[in-house]
């Protein structure tokens, strides 16, 4: 990535390397990706490229795979709403995946094979009085989708020291539980543009990064 002087925009690229040895590389085999987000690789072999987080590129989600020659092959495109600020993707299976739309307070379910929208899961009823709710990084465990919730005001700052998650049933795509912790003095459950900011260990215990002060 190359950041512009004001810090809110720039150019980012991704490319596939045949090994991890030192070398000299250029962008001749690279693809442009959205600035402010990172490509998301899944266990299925899919690599998703999100649009620019601040809305400076076409609002579309692209799915790629790598062929035997190490070239990127586009497998499909899903058009996203304007000002979505898409930030994270998890796959349930070959027929359902989820993308969190921070700017709209929505988690969108879509078919990763056909790249067609299935449903919108609106989480705006979970917002605090002083903030808007912004779904962030996600993880699936035992048929439930756990979504980190960033409650932020117009300055991207929290109003309360709450850790909050939404638990969604992946069969119905309905909200089952709003999980709130007010005792740890932390906030912002997960970092939205970091898919590794929520993870699960061998015992299926879920861990998440939060912000404190």
Give residue ranges: language-model regions.
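Short glycine/acidic-enriched loop and turn motifs that connect beta-strands
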Residues: 6-9, 53-57, 103-106, 152-156, ...
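Repeated scaffold domains used in trafficking and secretory/extracellular systems
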Residues: 33-44, 83-90, 130-138, 185-199
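Short coil/turn segments that connect the beta-strands within blades of beta-propeller domains
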Residues: 44-45, 94-95, 142-143, 203-205
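Blade-loop segments of beta-propeller domains
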Residues: 27-90
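Beta-propeller blade signature
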Residues: 160-173
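A short loop-to-beta-strand structural motif that recurs across blades of beta-propeller domains
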Residues: 12-13, 60-62, 106-109, 163-166
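Asp-box/WD-like beta-propeller blade repeats and closely related beta-sheet repeat scaffolds
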Residues: 75-94, 100-108, 112-140
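Surface-exposed loop and turn segments in beta-propeller and other repeat-based domains
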Residues: 26-32, 73-82, 120-131, 174-193
